């Protein structure tokens, strides 16, 4: 039996979620991924403990194996409040943005769209750990700010992936 039990985060009124393994799932050895059927959906934003317990053909129960602190997250991160806005005239590379959650990885991309030719465009700057924290980041000079072409017109975008792999 595989059981997901809420241990924190968002409320899950259907917890615990249990499913019986069957067929090839019951064979000895490693099973890196397998679908769990006949189980109600988990709740986004909930933290679960995962319990595995088996019974052999003689009816002997195994000791339960428990994995704690599994965050179930299916919501893509939201990136908002990006500044400077399109068509702004600036003489710096400071930006403002807001992240809905901590990002596992992220980047800011300056893509030239007009003006003086910039053969190095697009400029992709990976966000450092402190720049990926959830919340507002105001008038920030990135640790690895790009060297943009004077007279270039750029579109700025921010991309990110959260710890669950949501983009």
Task: Tell me what each language-model feature is.
Residues 91-95:
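Structural beta-strand segments of beta-rich domains
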Residues 9-26, 87, 115-135:
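Low-complexity "stalk/linker" and mucin-like segments enriched in Ser/Thr/Pro/Ala/Gly
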Residues 52-54, 158-160:
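Conserved structural position at the C-terminal beta-strand
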Residues 80-90:
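Short, solvent-exposed loop/edge segments of extracellular or virion-exposed proteins
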């Amino acid at each position: 039996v595989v059981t997901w039990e809420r241990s924190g985060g968002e409320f899950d009124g259907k917890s615990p979620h249990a499913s019986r393994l069957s067929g090839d799932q019951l064979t000895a050895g490693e099973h890196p991924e397998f679908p769990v059927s006949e189980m109600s959906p988990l709740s986004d934003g909930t933290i679960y403990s995962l319990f595995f317990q088996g019974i052999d053909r003689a009816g002997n129960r195994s000791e339960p194996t428990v994995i704690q602190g599994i965050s179930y997250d299916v919501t893509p991160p939201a990136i908002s409040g990006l500044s400077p806005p399109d068509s702004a005239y600036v003489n710096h590379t400071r930006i403002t943005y807001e992240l809905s959650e901590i990002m596992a990885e992220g980047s800011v991309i300056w893509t030239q769209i007009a003006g003086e030719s910039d053969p190095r465009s697009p400029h992709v700057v990976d966000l450092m750990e402190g720049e990926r924290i959830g919340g507002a980041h105001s008038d920030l000079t990135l640790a690895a700010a790009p060297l943009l072409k004077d007279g270039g017109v750029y579109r700025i975008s921010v991309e990110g992936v959260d710890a669950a792999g949501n983009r």
